Amino acid sequence: DVPPAAVTLLVVPGRDWSGDDLDWLRDLSARGHPLAGHGWRHRCDPPRTLHHRLHSLFISRDVAEHLSLDGAGIAALIQDCHRWFVEHGLTPSPLYVPPAWALGRIEPEALAALPFRYFETLGGVYDARERRFIRLPLVGFEADTAWRAWSLNLFNRANLAMALMAGRSLRVSIHPQDLYYKLGGQVEAWVRRLDRTLDYPALA
């Protein structure tokens, strides 16, 4: 069995959380699941830059909300995210995961001043306190179209090969609807391939 500490649950504060929902989150936290901040709305404003347009087209659709913001806006969003946990009696993980792993343009000095220590991207995890990037391969299953299924299969195989060759840990990303998408039948098999698990602070 995978220990709760190895399964980090991502929380989007700006959603419509009821009192029962918050009690459920507190119960999950009490059972040992880390709760990580995950943006604010999980929705972005219309793309204004070519980079954001291409990112939306090929990767993130309308969820990469950091890419709509400048550095100050990104920092404010992350601060608000952390504050929401505290105000609702929840213990935030030291990890922050931007929607679609798209952190946006923000300076290392600004990240170091924020209450989260670790920031996850497609390529790995950035430790803002130590100012170092920990490269970690990633596999995912959010494939609701044939194109996404094909490209994610290639992505997953390449990242598994990278993990094996470099002797690195492999991150496994599972979204709530992934089991019902085109790669849903692969999720359990990938999880079974894991011979041990780590929590994020253990990577530092």
Language model features by range: what are they?
Residues R132-K182:
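A conserved mid-domain beta-alpha-beta active-site/ligand-binding segment of alpha/beta enzyme cores
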Residues V7-L9, L35-H38, P94-Y96, Y118-T121, ...:
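Hydrophobic faces of well-ordered beta-strands that scaffold small-molecule active sites
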Residues T49-L69:
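Active-site gating loops and adjacent loop-to-helix segments of metal-dependent hydrolytic enzymes
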Residues L28, H33-H52:
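Short, solvent-exposed beta-strand-terminating loops
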Residues V2, V7-T8, Y118-F119, S169, ...:
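C-terminal domain-boundary segment and adjacent tail
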Residues L10-D21, R43-P47, V97-I106, A146-N153, ...:
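Acidic-and-aromatic substrate-binding clefts and catalytic sites of carbohydrate-active enzymes
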Residues D1-P34, S93:
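Active-site beta->alpha N-cap acidic-glycine motif
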Residues L67-E142, Y180-G185:
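Catalytic domains of cell-wall/extracellular-matrix polysaccharide-remodeling enzymes
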